[in-house]
Amino acid sequence: TPSTVLVTHLLLAHSVSWPLLANEMAVFLIGTGFALLANLYMASNQQDIDNYRIQVEEQLRKILLRFEYFLKAGDGRNDATLIKELDTILQEALALVYLDHSNHLFHQTNYHIHYFEMRQAQNRILEDMAGNINNCQLAASESLILARLFSKTAQQLSQENPAHELVEEIETCLAVFRERPLPKTRQEFETRATLLQLLRDLETFIKLKVEFYQNYQKVQAS
């Protein structure tokens, strides 16, 4: 490092004089200056990061709309292919933003890191939900309510959307579910339990986004 070179030169000189100090300081400043300039002008990966963000949000949208279809149709066949594809995209995106963060001294990439980590956490929730979707064989009235929520969530995935209204709507739906008549058959009971779990998972999914938005609201406004 420049500081190591400076100390080594002073030790080898066996003396300290103003001309020597001035010369070594000039060497230090030149070396540090070139390093900073190289860092500032190093190519940014911003365009690639933005492209990954678009891919991630589009893939999330496809998954949520697929869930909506399964709930409306009462068809639980789901191999989670889209979720696996999204996991691959997220791994690639995170590798890029980690690299971008290490390569830029003044380039702020914490926002991007936390954004893709938030989406990764959401995808893990979707993976659990996909398994529960497979158990929803009954096209119950509650299924249609939840399907509508999946559709609305798919429409509000943008990083700029705070998603507060979705959380409130889920709370309302939970209250509605509690007031409905008790299931009459074992199948209805199991489906109701699965639907409630899906609703709670969806609430967690959305709250991850709400928390992220609250933490980075100033970044979005700047």
Language model segments and positions:
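General secondary-structure edge motif
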Residues: V5-H9, L40, Q47, A95, ...
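Short, functional N-terminal and low-complexity linear motifs
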Residues: G31-A35, I89-E92, Y115-Q120
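Soluble C-terminal extramembrane regulatory/interaction domains of multi-pass membrane proteins
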Residues: Q59, I63-F67, Y111-S222
